[in-house]
Amino acid sequence: MKRKIIVGTLLTLWVFGCGIFLADDWHYRSYIPDNIAIGKTRFSNSDLLGVTEGCGVHVYQLLPRTKSKITTQGLSFFTDASGQMGNLNWQPTPRTDWQRSENWVYELQCIRSPVPGNLMKLIMEGARTPGGYYAATPERQWMILPKQNLVVFSHRG
């Protein structure tokens, strides 16, 4: 009987943990504008799993259909959009504010765990070379990097 209780408790905790992970992923995906189609989550971490205001960086795969539209339309893909995306001040890369490392560290400093593979290198490369786009509000930043097939969302607060 004691063993069944322990196994049941552990199973319940595991299911609860998986639920929190899925809810967290869904929550941060909701900040990506609707007309930017994203695929799998390449990297995600944030303070307190979205329970309170925190700091985090989330990297998603950019799907080919959006990549081709961005490649064709350029900056107008973002500036001509309605809703959330059209209201942001989108700028093309290279990011002039990232010429000094202390500036970019601010937006990516929430990365608390090791970034898999060469993902950080791809983000830095995309931000420092032409072909990508970025926008920011006081607490949120988006980078769309078609050449790297990445969408980066970071938040503070």
Residue ranges and their predicted role:
Residues M1-K4:
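Positively charged n-region of N-terminal signal peptides that target proteins for export
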Residues L10-G83, N87:
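N-terminal export/targeting and maturation segments
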Residues L150-V152:
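Amphipathic alpha-helical dimerization/oligomerization modules
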Residues F77-Q148, G157:
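Functional cores of ribonucleases/endoribonucleases
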Residues V7-G8, W104:
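General helical structural elements
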Residues P64, H155-G157:
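Secondary-structure transition/turn motif
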